[in-house]
Amino acid sequence: MEFTVSGTTVRFDERTMQFAFTRDGAEWNTCADFKPTLQCAQGTFAFADATSITHEQRETGTGTGICSIFTGFGHSAYSFETYVWVERASGDVLFEWIPLNEQGLNITNVTWPAAMDFDCADDHDTTLITHEQGVMIPNTWPTAVSTKDITFDGRFETAGGYMPWFAQLRADGHGYIAICETPWNAGYGIDHPSNGPYTHINTWFEPSLGTMNYRRVVRYQFLDHADHTAVCKAYRSYVNERGRLRTLAEKAARNPSVRDLIGRSWVHIGIKTKVQPDSYYYDKDHPEKNESL
């Protein structure tokens, strides 16, 4: 399947379920060896393990996309839909994961959409994550980085991902920002081996109160002539368009003490920890670890 909307071309291989996107003369492909999965109490299933998979192109007044329905995993009737479409107004690509029938599986994690192919051994090819004060990882960086190295496994709106986005920038100025529009039960996974030559990053979703129960959405905006500043401006513009931007001046008007924080250092360090015996984090085998100063 192939279509073009507002300057963005999408190609979809129904056999491998890989996507390719072209915009501003740059092509982006999902990783060939990345398998989107459902992790659940009953085991782990790749999307491709579904007993029934259907694909159809869908066109609406807001855009054009590919709707896929996956049904039957193991001995269950569990089913879900993915909808990957281009927004006509912006040319952005939206990835939507939608539960249809949640009977038969107890989902703990959904890994989708797939990471982008970002495998050039160039120290100007970089990945941006909003971990703590922000991290830029060149593809040739000597230190390995995995999801377990990130605070709270990269959960959005925590120290692992204060803002719900990540980005990748190529040496030639092409890049993308992936914005999670439903960040409440979501985060990112990352894989960067020592010295590269690649960095793979993707979104994960988890259930809310035991079920997936609502649509999950990630927006990919492809950029040209981009650097880390352009990425941040793109996110700022996205938030502002939706009426959610709060500038530092506005925050200071509401709370004047904000002005006292300008120019101050921010240090991530614990001062005192006391874990209560009824807490999930209480260590019964090593009680001395439950208190520190």
State where each predicted segment sits.
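Carbohydrate-recognition beta-sandwich/jelly-roll modules
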Residues: 2-293
